[in-house]
UniProtKB/Swiss-Prot annotation:
InterPro entries: Class_I_gatase-like, CobQ/CobB/MinD/ParA_Nub-bd_dom, CobQ_GATase1, CobQ_N, CobQ_synth, GATase_3, P-loop_NTPase. Residues 251-439 form the GATase cobBQ-type domain. NCBIfam families: cobQ (TIGR00313), PRK00784.1 (NF001989). HAMAP family: CobQ (MF_00028). This is Cobyric acid synthase. Belongs to the CobB/CobQ family. CobQ subfamily. It holds the Pfam family GATase_3. The keyword tRNA-binding does not apply. Keywords: Cobalamin biosynthesis, Glutamine amidotransferase. The active site is at 333 (nucleophile), 431. It comes from Caulobacter sp. (strain K31). GO terms for biological process: cobalamin biosynthetic process.
Length: 486
């Protein structure tokens, strides 16, 4: 089985982007490639064609491989619901919510599941590119590991270790990993890659030689800072803490409050990339700007908990004042639920049973009951000819008089969402409404904005090709291919 696992010296070192870029690179060379991540922790999820869910990063990597995503590409997905607990999704289906300690007891069975999914992918591919999680150097997590070295040994996959030079101390990170790993794990690593370098690469030649001397691992190259990676979805909310702003020429101001369990925030990437917008994620403790044109309440993994969090920031007061001034408000999924009169969880789906008043901007009520809805959707925005495509991923049913004025009309006749009588507040369950150019233009037209044309998916595809070309020039691809067994 030809394969390579990309592990990192920490979280957010660029593993997901490098795997996506390498997927596209080897696909462009004519290989059948499949992405794989044994265990992911993220509230950014994607719906597969068979109605399952996987990490959004693996869905992107499937795009890079020019193949539909499947649940086997990310067989274990952890979706945090609290600081110590998460919803566990196995091969696309929710199996329950577990505290961190209780989850440890599941790992032996889950390791077998991940290896089986990996082998199913390998059977249909020339190459499987595997992404680790966090860092193998977190040796306190080594026992029972299924995300990094535990999986690599069980599936017999060679490893390349990534160091992020943009953070600094990359020599210490790689040499330190070599120091703390046991002999078998060190031997599993067949080389290292420096990532996110800015400037003249020759300035770090001595640093790379020192890493080789201290670790004995071969140098597989140094990838530059990839500006085009900004067109790709971020996997973790930590990326939102470093917003990239490009002011100048933007007119409409759009803000998205960063809820504590914010989910699927990558759906706003088309807005972040639109030069006609002043778009930002609003950090906790920051008031909603008085000159905001549109406030978007995003999806969340825990609606009731984040409704409490929203009020703790004072955002409820700000949003209601914004609406009274004639500002526009849009709610997506959990954000849509918050805009209604009440949210109830009688069976404790998200935690302890309970209910809370919503913001009352839409005449609807939500009850968190029933099976999770996971499906791709398409249709038109009500009152326009603009077509949209997206996906639903939620628990709960929303009903009320406001639903008589739906926001979306699905192909086939059903409807979704609600719109206020004055048309300034709207919400729906569907994620991905800004992806298609015509839907984005229709949604932003009331703000007086001529949105950038074109589907965001085409921009992502072009970015993947650009990243692949850069990696072809900057990494030792022939050595990487030999290690992988291609």
């Amino acid at each position: 089985m030809a394969s390579l696992m990309i592990q990192g010296c920490g979280s957010d070192v660029g593993k997901s982007t490098l795997v996506a870029g390498l997927c596209r690179l080897f696909v462009n060379r004519g290989l059948i490639v499949r992405p794989f991540k044994p265990q992911n922790m993220s509230n950014n999820a994607a719906v597969t064609e068979d109605g399952g869910e996987i990490g959004r990063a693996q869905a992107l990597q499937a795009i890079a491989c020019r193949t539909p995503p499947t649940v086997h590409m990310n067989p274990v997905l952890l979706k945090p619901q609290s600081d110590v607990g998460a919803q566990v999704v196995v091969r696309g289906k929710v199996v329950g919510a577990y505290q961190a300690r209780a989850f440890q007891g599941l790992k032996p069975d889950l390791l077998a599941t991940t290896v089986e999914s990996y082998r199913l992918l390998a059977a249909e591919a020339d190459l499987v590119l595997v992404e680790g999680a966090g860092s193998p150097a977190e040796t306190n997590l080594r026992a029972g590991d299924i995300a990094n070295m535990g999986f690599a040994h069980a599936a017999d996959v060679p490893v390349a270790l990534i160091g992020d030079i943009d953070r600094g101390h990359v020599i210490a990170a790689l040499a330190g990993a070599h120091l703390v790993l046991d002999a078998a794990d060190r031997e599993r690593i067949k080389g290292f890659i420096i990532n996110k370098f800015r400037g003249d690469p020759s300035l770090f030649d001595e640093g790379r030689r020192e890493i080789v001397a201290r670790t004995g691992w071969p140098d597989l190259g140094m990838a530059p800072w990839l500006a085009s990676a900004r067109a790709l979805p971020a996997e973790d909310a930590v990326a939102l803490e470093r917003p990239v702003r490009e002011d100048g020429g933007r007119r409409a101001k759009i803000v998205v409050p960063m809820l504590s369990r914010i989910a699927n925030f990558d759906e706003f990437d088309p807005l972040r990339a639109d030069p006609s917008l002043d778009f930002s994620f609003l950090p906790p403790g920051t008031p909603v700007p008085g000159d905001a044109d549109l406030v978007i309440l995003p999806g969340t993994k825990a609606t009731l908990a984040d409704l409490t969090f929203l009020r703790a920031q004072g955002w409820d007061i700000d949003i209601l004042a914004h609406a009274r001034r004639g500002g526009r408000v849009l709610g997506v999924c959990g954000g849509y639920q918050m805009l209604g009169r009440t949210v109830s969880d009688p069976e404790g789906v998200e935690g302890a049973p309970g209910s809370a008043p919503g913001l009352g901007l839409l005449d609807v009520e939500t009850v968190l009951l029933g099976d999770k809805v996971l499906r791709a959707t398409a249709g038109r925005l009500v009152g326009t000819d603009a077509a949209f495509s997206g996906y639903e991923m939620h628990i709960g049913r929303t009903t009320g008089q406001g639903a008589a004025r739906p926001m979306l009309a699905f192909d086939g006749g059903a409807a979704d969402g609600a719109v206020s009588a004055d048309g300034r507040v709207a919400g729906a369950y569907v994620h991905g409404l800004f992806e298609r150019g015509e839907a984005r233009a229709a949604l932003l037209a009331p703000l007086g904005v001529a949105a950038s044309s074109g589907d965001h998916a085409a921009q992502v595809d072009a970015a993947l090709d650009e990243i692949a070309a850069v990696l072809e020039r900057s990494l030792d691809i022939e050595a990487i291919a030999r290690i992988a067994g291609v």
